[in-house]
Amino acid sequence: MAVSIEDIKKLRAMTGAGLADVKKALTEAEGDFDKAKELLRERGLAIAAKRSDRETSNGCVLVKKVNDFAAIIALKCETDFVANGADFIKLTSDILDAAIAAKAHTLDEVKTLKVGDADAQAAVTQRSGITGEKMELDGYCVLEGDNIEVYDHMNKHTLCTMVQLNENNEEAGHKVAMQVAAMRPVALDESSVSNETKKTELEVAVAKTKEELVEKAVNAALKKAGINPAHVDSEEHIESNTKKGWLTPEQAEEARNIKKTVGEEKAATLNPTMIQNIANGRLAKFFKENCLVDQEFQFGDGDKQTVAQYLASQSKDLKIVAYQRFTLAAE
């Protein structure tokens, strides 16, 4: 049967599907709108299933607060073209609104909430079928209580943060939310860093310290032999620089011997106490750079101060209760 342009426009407005897909569905459904919508839904599911193994590195991240409940959610897709589309952003916003209205605490809860004519997960799958891109929900996190500030970095919908203070101070809360966006803290304070992370960072610090001390001894021996350490820092460089004439074959062999013998001798005589002290210093630096309250505050007007010092300058008892951060941007 013939399908009118008015019917095509109407169904397209209802579903967001492409004109060709809408026309085909209406034709197969013989003008029955409900049947045509079901055909479009089924085809969308099939298309989404075919794309399940694709990477979703773009998307839309939104944050919102209503009264004492705030949440961040991300709807991921494959391309920035789809991510920046009004329909995609609206779907993300609708899902976030539903999550906040229900005060959902987990992503699994969010996926079951009603959004339009379907639950959130089904709505995402339908949109995936329409666009032809894989889509998935991610990054859902919440804060609940008083004194919460939310921040969408540059309103680009790719990085959002939330901060909760123990006292009402909107300006301080907003600035700390910007700090969280800019400086990517891994924990609120040192006590909040997991034991696993502390152990890993200390092991890395010990290994790096040993490597640097051995390298320093080897480089000193190379320089004493008249060999530029930069020319022999890898076997590949030794071979290529010998071919270029920057090293003689004899120098190349001497460099290999120095790296092996001096390196082994230095590694065997390293002072464990000194290694541990240096590694502990590096771990302290890790805490300073990655714990929110200890980070250098980026939005002050005067002298350098930590985030904790900034808060104390606003109110002596002002503290951060919790924070959340989610981004799709490469960092």
Predicted regions and their residues:
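N-terminal assembly/interaction segments in proteins that build large macromolecular machines
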Residues: 2-331
